């Protein structure tokens, strides 16, 4: 199994994707999960010359001996009542699929929507309707769209596909040959044991987001910084016949001041300049190298590491 990680690891520390890709390379990674989670209307990728921007990072990756192997499309809620928000979400998601085609990426994760007070059946119906808007672009570009599990920690009492069984049921309900599943180990760790849930996905498991936490919050930290049972997950991936990349998604291993899951405690320094609010690039570089070496050790331990 080959190791990949997300460009979001350096989203806080670097201004451009070129810089982020170089940092991944520096840490030992050769396979890239391209994050397109936070596009804005003024993003270079949403402009008329977007293909030129994509070509830049493609050529950079090739020059470094790296490959784009997975992606995460625009974040947002397709079931939001804010029409402008949903309109941009759709445009950015379609653009992300087109970008995947140019980069040679075959699988991108597209989050499903959530809404209060709707049943599982209504959720299936509304989210299928959103995915159907992606079908023509998916088919034209040859890019699979993957749904992803979440957790009650994030979704509260709202229905969501938090289990492998429900994910597979939804994939089969959508009934399109280019809709599959991505399993997030951190989200699952907030729910409990996950061996049976991974097995329930079966051959619909096309990608993973590997991250750790303490089971109470969606922390997205590096392996062994939380309580995830790594043997359980590794055995499940082997037993289910998973053939994708071992893709890390541990982009908040270091806590920024306003991190959405757990912001840093506030301190009013008065007239003094506060100097220790944010983690620094040199810290993330250490974390990144550690993540690669840890992932390699994990895969080597089970005899499944592949360069």
Question: Language-model segments: which ranges?
Answer:
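Glycine-rich, proline-tolerant flexible connector loops at the mouths of alpha/beta enzymes
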Residues: 33-58, 118, 155
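Short glycine-enriched, charge-decorated loop/helix-capping segments at active-site entrances
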Residues: 44-48, 83-86, 221-225
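Active-site-proximal flexible loops/turns
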Residues: 13, 40-42, 77-79, 118, ...
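Conserved beta-strand positions in the central sheet of alpha/beta enzyme cores
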Residues: 33, 70, 109, 146, ...
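Acidic (Asp/Glu)-rich catalytic clusters
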Residues: 21-28, 48-70, 94-104, 135-140, ...
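Histidine-acidic metal/acid-base catalytic patches
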Residues: 1-4, 14-28, 161-307
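Active-site beta-loop-alpha junctions enriched in small/polar residues
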Residues: 6-11, 35-39, 73-76, 113-115, ...
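Active-site acidic/histidine proton-transfer and metal-coordination neighborhood
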Residues: 59-63, 78-183, 190, 268-274, ...
